[in-house]
Amino acid sequence: MQATEANFDGLVGPTHNYAGLSFGNVASQNNEKSIANPKAAARQGLRKMKQLADLGFHQGVLPPQERPSMRLLRELGFSGDDATVIARVAKDAPELLAAASSASAMWTANAATVSPSADTHDGRVHFTPANLCSKLHRAIEHESTRRTLRAIFNDADRFVVHEALPGTPALGDEGAANHTRFCADYAARGVEFFVYGRSEYRRGPEPKRFPARQTFEASRAVAHRHGLAEAATVYAQQNPDVIDAGVFHNDVIAVGNRNTLFCHQLAFVEQNAVYDELRSKLTELKADFNVIEVPDAQVSVADAVTSYLFNSQLLTRPDGKQVLVVPQECRENPRVAAYLDGLTSHAGPIDDVLVFDLRESMKNGGGPACLRLRVVLDDAERAAVTQGVWINDTLFGRLDTWIEKHYRDRLAPADLTDPQLLAESRTALDELTQILGLGSLYDFQR
């Protein structure tokens, strides 16, 4: 049966703001306390989804999570009605209100790790929501993520949505941002590639400036849970020096698709050995392996971090050629722009580059790859997905109108104290679940 890759992008939520919550994420820290535009952010992401759908890619949407998270604030000891809780947190612990209000669930590359049915022990698609335990504002996401995934992938004969791994530093899991899959064809068995920043129990190099968020132990646990064959699984350590330079996830320094890996020269520890293991295991599956390694002399790690060259989507078009989806910051960096011009002028796996304005997300450290969760589906599996989440002309129009109706065009950190923002968000999300056909997804609907 034929299979293709679908991308499920996160729809930016109404509380999108710049609180600078993510230590190790250079853009997040640099833009702390800036004025955000949630309406523009949501529309920028939606336009990317629509353009890719128009090009023939299977494109779905994942809804925002409810924010601010009143559950978190009440669990932390604040009581009273919603307005009273928000006022008390704003006065006593504004950093907790910022964490509870973050729209970071829009970066669905961190939502889960996904293994397609061709790779798993039981022939079903497996999802493990990421515990994201390194950051408070993200550690509160996984329960809602699991609920959302189960609403969309609700056929138990075809899909398994697990619980997140235990939320301990030893099992720190950041999802698909540290995972990719290589194969000759999407329907064929592939090699799954897990990248970690440190190991809890093994000796090895670690970053000194910024934390490594993904552990080897978490990656191995996900592979075991999904029933992946050891002969078709590769683990690699991310270069700790690039983590210290702001590469907080592997998808800021590398991206893969089918049999192609596009990465920076300094992406991994023992990089050539990583290539050799991937090539060897793919050869066993009768698949070729292509590496496009970007020299540090042409594009530095600093350029990669500011432009998000590697936080791109590498997609296979219906005609079999590959296209690289990059943020407009890549065209604004002269060295990165020159590299991309050369990349497509030579005969190689990547035939074209598409450029998108994702400025609102980029200012928080999220490019095209951050905004999407990849799910390989065969024809029957795709038909089993809740159909209301697929982007088409009708859904695009309804979502665009919904954004115009419900989203603010200006949100400063001080605005998070406004209890009306919670009311506005709940009204918007209640309508959204009806648009997408997802039922009572949120706590306030139950």
Curated annotation (Swiss-Prot):
Q: In which pathway does it act?
A: Amino-acid degradation; L-arginine degradation via AST pathway; L-glutamate and succinate from L-arginine: step 2/5
Keywords noted in UniProt:
Arginine metabolism, Hydrolase
Q: Which reaction does it catalyse?
A: N(2)-succinyl-L-arginine + 2 H2O + 2 H(+) = N(2)-succinyl-L-ornithine + 2 NH4(+) + CO2
One GO biological process from the UniProt record? Answer: arginine catabolic process to glutamate
Which Pfam families does the UniProt record give?
AstB (PF04996)
User: Which residues are noted in the entry as substrate-binding?
Assistant: 19-28, 110, 137-138, 213, 251, 364
Query: Which sites are catalytic?
Result: 174, 249, 370 (nucleophile)
Report the leader peptide range: none
A single Gene Ontology MF term assigned here is: N-succinylarginine dihydrolase activity
Question: Under which EC number(s) is this enzyme classified?
Answer: 3.5.3.23
Q: Which domain of life is it from?
A: Bacteria
State the oligomer form and interacting partners: Homodimer.
Name the HAMAP family on file: AstB (MF_01172)
**Member of which family?**
Belongs to the succinylarginine dihydrolase family.
Q: What does this protein do?
A: Catalyzes the hydrolysis of N(2)-succinylarginine into N(2)-succinylornithine, ammonia and CO(2).
Entry-linked NCBIfam families: arg_catab_astB, PRK13281.1
Instruction: Quote the PANTHER family the UniProt record gives.
Output: N-SUCCINYLARGININE DIHYDROLASE (PTHR30420:SF2)
Q: What is this protein called?
A: N-succinylarginine dihydrolase
